[in-house]
Amino acid sequence: MTSFVGLLDLPGIRWRPSPTDVDSSRETRELPVALARLLEPVDGLVAIDGGLHIRGARSRLPWHDLHPVWKGERVLSILYDAVTPEDVPFAANCMGDQFLLRDGAVVQLIAETGELEHVDASLESFLQRSAARDPEIWLGLRYLEQFELEN
């Protein structure tokens, strides 16, 4: 079993769910093992100064719950041809691009075009590199910063 970079290790945490936001009775068995393990201690969060949203699997909050975009009323595999029902949309950046787990690897769905780009070989390496990459470019954080300055 590999050691995981935990969600709380990500820099710039802006939000994380309170205990009342989490429905502990919800099952996580359908999730890939790595994602279920990652979400066990903290059911997702918003980190990297708002640039990265890791969705929760047991969330009571519709905007934070991964199930609607995975298997529910906003399922990405219907909205985008390149996304399959097996892809798990576990995260999004501040520009609306989605990060999907596909056969253990992380791919990025470019929301504007519907194209997929390979990002990392595993969820673990995705998290490790998330903190090291330039978030202004990689996550589109410069646009979020500009919006915050102007509003």
Where are the model-predicted features located?
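A surface-exposed partner-binding patch
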Residues: 1-101
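Generic alpha-helix signal with a bias toward terminal, lower-confidence helices
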Residues: 20, 51, 64-66, 102, ...
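Short polybasic amphipathic segments
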Residues: 98, 104-109
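Compact, glycine/acidic-enriched structural inserts
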Residues: 107-143
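Low-complexity intrinsically disordered segments
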Residues: 144-151
